[in-house]
Every structure is written in structure tokens, then in C-alpha cells.
Amino acid sequence: NPYNSQYTRGLEDSTISGFGEMQTRLKVNIWGNDSGSSAMAIMPFIKFPTNAEELENDDVEGGVTVPIGFKLPMDLNMGFMTEFDFNRNAAEDGYHTEFINSITLSHSIIGELSGYVEFFSNITDGDRSEWIGTIDAGLTYALTKDIQLDAGMNIGVTRSADDFNPFCLYFY
């Protein structure tokens, strides 16, 4: 992320700003993509610690994402995603694996505006790991072929998930 600003609210409010980490990824289409009723890709990625102090960790991390998408009747789209992340552990003495999965159902509302619902799951192989599960809903708007706005709410359905996490993002 080129520039980050994190605001934390608690006993003492704080704001941290600066240059974020840099991630590079490669997308290999297995089938589909621009045409057809389904698509699948494999996307390995690696994160480099180019961030300002305290914004992120200072470690190289990476993983692989496998998204699969289907066009359904009535202009519905369904997506599945599996991801394996190899991240530095909290003690900073090794790495752990995170297993991330999601299933998404989306529908065009009008023009370039679409809505979606999603179930998200994150399980870590660490000793004290807890399952994070959320039900998410949001809107996406395609500004151009390569730029998309995304706003919504993630609602935790497990104890370790945040109760509510509103978000507003842009992708390019």
C-alpha cells in the first residue's frame, strides 16, 4: 500500500501514518477470465517490508491464492477463494500458516454498481489460534475497467472475529 494511516481508538487514541508494505503477485489463469461461464486462477504473492515503523511487521511474508468464479442464472455470480499465507508469528521466532477461505454471491444492481454477500473464514495453525469467521455484505462500483470502489461491513460470527468492521477500499 503506497500510504497508510491507522487510527486506533481506546484508552489512548493514536494515529500512525507512513509508507506501507509492498506486495507483488503473479496471476496465472488456469481457465476462463474474460469469457465463458467460469474461471480459475493461481496467484502466488510475496510481501516486502518497505513499511514505516509500527505500521506493519518488518518481515518477508507470502502465500498463494486460488480464486474460482462462476456465472449463475438470473445474473448472479458466485466465487470461491482458498488462500494459504505464510506469515511471521507474534513471537517473531518463526512462521505460521493461515488458511483462508471464502464464498461470495454477487449481483449487478444498476450499471457498474453491484452488491454482494460473503462468508469468510481464517484458521491459523498456531498453538493458540482461534477460528475467525465473518458474514460480509457490501457494494462495489467499477469506475473504469481497472479501478473499483468497495464499501461494506464485515460482521463477526465467531468470538475471535471483530464484531463489526466497516470498510471502504479502492482497487486498481
Predicted regions and their residues:
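Transmembrane beta-barrel domains of Gram-negative outer membranes and organellar outer membranes
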Residues: 1-172
